[in-house]
Amino acid sequence: MSSIQASRGTRDILPEEIVYWQRVEAMARQILQRAAYQEIRTPMFEQTALFERGIGEATDIVGKEMYTFLDRGERSLTLRPEGTAGVVRALIEHKLFAQGGVQRLWYTGPMFRYERPQAGRQRQFHQLGVEVLGSADPRADAEVIAIATDLLQQLRLTDWTLMLNSVGNQEDRQRYRQALVDYLTPYQAELDPDSQERLHRNPLRILDSKDQRTQEICQQAPQILNYLGETSRQHFDRVQQSLTDLGIPYELNHRLVRGLDYYTHTAFEFQTTELGAQATVCGGGRYDRLVTELGGPDTPAVGWAIGLERLILLLQHQNISYEAKPDFYLVAKGEVAEPQALILAQKLRHHGFVVELDLSGSAFGKQLKRADRSGAPLCLILGDAEAEAQTVQLKWLASGEQEVLSQTDLLDRSNLLRQKIADSYSLKT
């Protein structure tokens, strides 16, 4: 019988990789808590109409990439392709906007899009996102960008660039849309097939085409910054000034429009040159009309989402290592020693140590070889003689230094050992 494998476009995250995910999630949680953001969790599937109204029926996501199905009640449901629409739906449904003030929220979880799988692009992928709802202040745009910058810097990532643009308000976009269509129409036959389809349906997305000839044509296309009204221009100027005040470098990119219809004013991406076609690690912008489009009160908002698979791929590409190693590797052999080793391991864990207990039952020699491979700085050796005397052998694996001490003394010295373990790790880095 043939084995069953993971579906195309999905992948298992194995223990040697999960340490990256845990580090990213822990770092993000710490940064977001310090900025007074609260976590929200929404369902993985929603009514299809939510995404059709929120993202836009003319987008590639809604038109080509959503996983949509009918349930047994003949209701059309869709696995979420992104997180913002669900967050807004939740706030409207639970009347959280009635509380007034500014809502600062963050989320993380799996998203689903039917795309051609490749490195950094899966059909099930994970996003970490933030949303600030209730503030039209340009400082809110700068704040969410600053938080993303903090996360990338805290993770020790380099070689990324913040790309910035404004897509204006609805009136600005309409003027620019017409100017872009007027410019591109004479070149229609030279555009790639996807761009030809988008010309009258969603022309701004043509600016994001990866086709070489289409990119050449777009080089001389009108720039949206020249079509901004005074209000939009002032907003964008203040965002840029705030980023300058914060010391966050950026580049203006007039072709940056993002792929979702709900964006207004500020649009931004954190891009890298190290992941080939999957250059965007984090993307976001302002979406002042989305809440009203989904039936809520007039509420300005801004946010971003990070693709965690791409972020972790970048960490690995830059050889940034996060290793999960035990503090102690506990070796035991003997009828008296083995049950006692389990008790000792639990006591050490209760003292806050990471303890790996060898459960193989193999000879001491084989267990000690596994201890060497574990990466633990300390090995505890417990035979029947030590167990009967309530002692244990403590061995520093790097130096071979070894001593015998009572199990009580071992626990009493926990603070000292914790400091020595920390020192041993710092010496390696």
UniProtKB/Swiss-Prot annotation:
This is Histidine--tRNA ligase. GO terms for cellular component: cytoplasm. Belongs to the class-II aminoacyl-tRNA synthetase family. Homodimer. Keywords: Aminoacyl-tRNA synthetase, ATP-binding, Cytoplasm, Ligase, Nucleotide-binding, Protein biosynthesis. The lineage of its organism: Bacteria, Bacillati, Cyanobacteriota, Cyanophyceae, Gomontiellales. GO terms for biological process: histidyl-tRNA aminoacylation. The keyword ATP-binding applies. GO terms for molecular function: ATP binding; histidine-tRNA ligase activity. It catalyses: tRNA(His) + L-histidine + ATP = L-histidyl-tRNA(His) + AMP + diphosphate + H(+). Pfam families: HGTP_anticodon (PF03129), tRNA-synt_His (PF13393). It comes from the Bacteria.
